[in-house]
Amino acid sequence: MDDRMVDQALHSEETSFELSLRPTMLKQYIGQSSIKNNLEVFIKAAKLREEPLDHVLLFGPPGLGKTTLSNIIANEMNVNIRTVSGPSLDRPGDLAAILSGLQPGDVLFIDEIHRLSSTVEEVLYSAMEDFFIDIIIGKGDEARSIRIDLPPFTLVGATTRAGSLTGPLRDRFGVHLRLEYYNENDLKEIIIRTAEVLNTKIDDESATELAKRSRGTPRVANRLLKRVRDFQQVNEDEQIYIETTKQALQLLQVDAEGLDYIDHKMMRCIINQYDGGPVGLDTIAVSIGEERITIEDVYEPFLIQKGFIERTPRGRKATAFAYEHFKNFNK
């Protein structure tokens, strides 16, 4: 699967770019007002008690700000943060080494926490609940268990698949926060802020247009802005104008609803090849040359959310809204 302009996942070359745009405190964070309000209370209460914040589970689609929020939590609590990904923790010893290096109150951020192995996850149980871990030293008859006490800390776990977490792990988080897709007003505000960080001027109409096509995701909004800025600079315009924005988005193949060429390919398959469906995912996968799991996890969710596809017992079916949007397919 090639990197897409509207892909919600982080592209490998975008890490430093995203870091430069991330807000560092809650007051700078745009959107997710319910989460912000709750975190403000939880953090203030923890600081008044002089205790670490309860363990926090952040879940929701990619690109909505889970990593940013984890860093904001550490900044607001005025503590250090250690960041790891679930798949990188192969053995219990890997996690034990990280936990034993934490200072009192520190934040441990585990991204993709749903991908922890069961043996590593079990080490977390006592660490989260009672702040100790048991490590087995030696093998066979000489094996013995050593208890290591840990300083109180805050675990922040992030996942796009909250349903994949085991009950015992999920229940050990005191704070559960679901990140929702952003509305266009919040995305527009993010785009204007990013333009300022990039020292780029953008007109109001362009910011609105980019927000409409960003699939409710700040990461997509910032990526599109960065590419439109390329067109503006090559054109030697003093700012990003709506004409340049529309031209750039057309060339980037991102339509008015935020759909790209792969979305179009999939919808064309359902509408034209299979008369709007219903058609099974395996059949769609073969027809467009993609894996079923990629369609199910990456392409399909946004199309369902936007009302282009509906799930039926017999397969996927194009909606009336989809026919209206793609009415020029056969012309």
From Swiss-Prot:
One of its GO terms (molecular function) is ATP hydrolysis activity. It is found in: Cytoplasm. SUPFAM superfamilies: P-loop containing nucleoside triphosphate hydrolases (SSF52540), Winged helix' DNA-binding domain (SSF46785). It is an enzyme of class 3 (hydrolase). Keywords: ATP-binding, Cytoplasm, DNA damage, DNA recombination, DNA repair, DNA-binding, Hydrolase, Nucleotide-binding. Gene3D superfamilies: 1.10.8.60, P-loop containing nucleotide triphosphate hydrolases, Winged helix-like DNA-binding domain superfamily/Winged helix DNA-binding domain. SMART domains: AAA (SM00382). Mg(2+) binds at residue 67. Belongs to the RuvB family. Homohexamer. Forms an RuvA(8)-RuvB(12)-Holliday junction (HJ) complex. HJ DNA is sandwiched between 2 RuvA tetramers; dsDNA enters through RuvA and exits via RuvB. An RuvB hexamer assembles on each DNA strand where it exits the tetramer. Each RuvB hexamer is contacted by two RuvA subunits (via domain III) on 2 adjacent RuvB subunits; this complex drives branch migration. In the full resolvosome a probable DNA-RuvA(4)-RuvB(12)-RuvC(2) complex forms which resolves the HJ. This is Holliday junction branch migration complex subunit RuvB. It comes from Staphylococcus haemolyticus (strain JCSC1435). The lineage of its organism: Bacteria, Bacillati, Bacillota, Bacilli, Bacillales. The gene is ruvB.
